A protein has these predicted regions:
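His/Glu-rich zincin catalytic helix
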Residues: 2, 17, 24, 29-79, ...
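Internal maturation/activation junctions in enzymes
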Residues: 251-346, 358-359, 366, 471-472
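Noncatalytic scaffold domains of N-terminal-nucleophile
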Residues: 78-180, 185-187, 192-237, 297, ...
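Short, small/polar residue-rich loop motifs at catalytic or cofactor-binding pockets
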Residues: 217, 324-327, 388-390
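Short, well-structured alpha-helical segments that form the helix of a local strand-helix-strand
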Residues: 111-122, 193-195, 211, 259-273, ...
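Active-site rim segments in enzyme catalytic domains, especially the processed small/beta chain
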Residues: 59-72, 76, 204-206, 338-403, ...
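Extended C-terminal subregions enriched in glycine
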Residues: 336, 384, 417, 426-473
Length: 505
């Protein structure tokens, strides 16, 4: 519980997102989803892992209206849900998640937790460099919504780096939540404003959908990679993808390869294509999955997948979406070595781009993660959640948390987790070096590499059949804390691709 007035890990993780959704406004907010993984030491010194999967419980919930939505969209000739469509908006889960975690483990009142965010929203905060860079790219999206234009553009422009902005509508919304609790977001005037905004755009979400929303506590899933237990969120999250990916790569002697050489990146890319094919075929709401998690995590299955990889050339596989996405990740470890790994996201930058005029709530576009194929496990349907990309992670050794970490970047996240794990386990890197390493991913049939990858590696990938393009903008963003149990030291890492920092308190 911590000393009086001293914030514990979960209190810090409650106060921080409220501030971050303001200062990182283009990537998360009250209309976002939330996911957290926690590790605590019980009084008998036995380690226990708890993963709380909060948010996005009702994806377009409503048995009658949503049940008829899929054929209606198919009749319109739609093959996917557009990211800026009102049909892409799910009931936001973050507010309910914050309240549930605080109620379960917190010692501060909600109004105390929200006070810093309310202060910044009312009195202003400066725009960080990466935030300003990303915000400026969303002018067209923000200009398509009267609410977004009103609350997120300033004289018709994105705020410049270093400028100070205020968000009074969000401050008022937060004050209402601080006063009356999370249900003030899902019932009453705030919910009425949200539903009216969405219904005017054609959404079928109702006041009942918001009122019934509840988060869910789930049990984590894990696999062991050369002595390290990688712990991820279960489906409907894509954490399973990261576990399948490291299982595949365990069949190769990665340690013997140059960490920035073509062999290492070729194997990672080929294994990723296989793992993402598994994701896009199987991962969905657990009740709708036709192949269980245990079977997909079977080491023999991973070995059979590894056998499909040709070390000398690229093997054609189905294309995959761009890394993209906009997310905020943070992790905290307190004095008692309780760790929490938390991620919050609207999915795309500024989500759906749909924003309420009165309350300033920007809506997510998680519904675009559904598949518009009636026979697919991840098909759009009543009371279902779509395949979800946000995945905070924990790495465990001997039942204790070794590293609490995450890598922002939508579809890139499983690859980011894998590269972090390999960098730490196979190449002995500390968390900062593991996060700083240059990255390679793919978009469709194009292999994308960051500028830090050596020219010889690029040529080596091309020689193996990869069509390589250098990506001018970095993707992903890792934050990590390692617990050195022997020396009693915490080691933090925060990479330069984002506006983060490693901070001791």
């Amino acid at each position: 519980q911590g000393h009086r007035g001293t914030p514990t890990v979960l209190l810090l993780l409650q106060a921080a997102p409220q501030v971050f959704f303001l200062i990182q406004g283009e990537v998360l907010g009250q209309g976002a989803d939330d996911a957290a993984g926690t590790h605590r030491i019980d009084q008998d010194a036995v380690a226990a892992q708890v993963v709380l999967r909060m948010g996005n419980l009702e994806a377009l919930k409503g048995q009658s209206t949503v049940g008829s939505l899929l054929p209606a969209l198919l009749d319109k000739g739609m093959t996917s849900i557009p990211a800026t469509s009102p049909f892409a908006v799910n009931v936001p889960g973050a507010i309910e998640a914050w309240g549930a975690i605080l109620k379960a483990r917190g010692t501060w009142s909600l109004d105390r937790v929200l006070a810093p965010a309310i202060n910044y929203a009312e009195n202003g905060f400066p725009i960080a460099p990466r935030v300003g860079f990303d915000w400026a790219k969303q002018l067209a999206k923000l200009g398509n919504s009267e609410g977004a234009t009103r609350h997120y553009l300033f004289n018709g422009q994105a705020p410049a780096e270093g400028s100070v902005i205020k968000l009074p509508a969000l401050a008022a919304t937060l004050k209402a939540i601080a006063k009356d609790g999370p249900r003030a977001f899902y019932e009453g005037p705030i919910a009425e404003d949200m539903v009216a905004t969405l219904n005017a755009k054609g959404s079928v979400l109702s006041l009942e959908d918001f009122a019934k929303h509840r988060g869910e506590a789930q049990t984590p899933i894990s696999t062991n990679y050369r002595g390290l237990d990688l712990v991820e969120l279960p489906p409907n999250g894509q954490g399973l993808t990261a576990l399948v990916l490291v299982n595949i790569l365990e069949n190769f002697d990665m340690k013997s390869l140059d960490p920035v050489g073509p062999d290492r990146f070729h194997l990672q890319l080929e294994a990723a294509r296989l793992a993402f094919a598994i994701r896009d075929t199987h991962i969905a709401e657990p009740a709708f999955m036709r192949v269980g998690v245990d079977k997909l995590l079977d080491k023999a299955f991973a070995k059979s997948l590894a056998a499909k990889i040709d070390r000398t050339k690229r093997v054609p596989l189905p294309p995959h979406p761009a890394p993209g996405g906009d997310t905020v990740y943070l992790t905290v470890v307190d004095k008692d070595r309780r760790a929490c790994s938390l991620i919050n996201s609207l999915y795309s930058s500024f989500g759906s781009g749909i924003c309420t005029e009165k309350t300033g709530v920007m809506f997510n576009n998680r519904g675009s993660g559904f598949v518009l194929k009636p026979d697919h496990p991840n098909a759009l349907g009543p009371a279902k959640r779509p395949m979800h990309t946000i995945i905070p992670a924990l790495a465990m050794k001997s039942g204790r948390c070794d590293v609490s970490f995450g890598v922002m970047g939508a579809h890139y996240q499983p690859m980011g987790h894998t590269q972090m794990v390999l960098n730490m386990v196979d190449y002995g890197m500390d968390v900062q070096a593991a996060a700083d390493m240059p990255r390679a991913f793919y978009e469709g049939n194009i292999t994308l590499v960051e500028r830090g990858i050596p020219a010889a590696t690029v040529e080596g990938l091309r020689a193996r059949g990869h069509e390589v393009a250098v990506e001018p903008s970095p993707w992903g963003g890792a934050q990590a804390i390692r617990i050195d149990w022997d020396r009693g030291v915490l080691i933090g890492g925060s990479e330069p691709r984002k506006d983060g920092c490693a901070l001791g308190y």
